[in-house]
Amino acid sequence: MTDIPDRDERHLARMLRKKAVIDERIANSPNECGLLLVLTGNGKGKSSSAFGMLARSMGHGMQCGVVQFIKGRHSTGEELFFRRFPEQVRFHVMGEGFTWETQDRQRDIAAAEAAWQVSRELLRDPSIGLVVLDELNIALKHGYLDLDQVLSDLQARPPMQHVVVTGRGAKAEMIELADTVTEMGVIKHAFQAGIKAQKGVEL
């Protein structure tokens, strides 16, 4: 029992030092600016994280836009939910299903190009505070879009606009351009045990 006060004092000293370091970093950080965030990797949670940021942005009263490049054959929970707020979210489902479902490369390219035209409109609009480009990485990975054009459009967006790009296999150039990159890893997934996608979890 006698060492409890000492432990508490040591803990307090550590936390004070940590706070001082964090406070200094915040004070020395540049002004606010629009961020490019890339969520990639084979694990679950990329789109879920993006839509969490969408909800957070809406909570701050921001105007937002969403373009889904691959998903589209079936309505997802996020689409059904965010479409309830048309005055705040422009939600575009432009895909025609996963690539193994369509089995038509030219059709996939046409769908991706149409989706990018919608994306460019959002990326040029300074009133839009957050743009989610869901599964854009997949479209780029399969060569459905011109990578240089995509990167150029992202760089030319309004200075305070945030963009979240999701999908496996993010291109090295996209990672280089991004401000924040998160790679989702797989430790265990229900699908490996033969459990199909569930409403409210994957759908």
Indicate residue ranges for each PLM-predicted region.
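Generic detector of well-ordered alpha-helical packing
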Residues: 69, 135-136
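Short glycine- and Lys/Arg-enriched binding-loop motifs that mark or flank ligand-binding interfaces
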Residues: 30, 39-41, 57, 163, ...
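Extreme N-terminal, non-catalytic leader segments
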Residues: 1-35
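Conserved P-loop
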Residues: 37-124
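Short coil/turn connectors at secondary-structure junctions
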Residues: 33-34, 61-62, 127-128, 159-160
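Short gly/ser/thr-rich secondary-structure transition/capping motifs
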Residues: 19-22, 113-116, 163-166
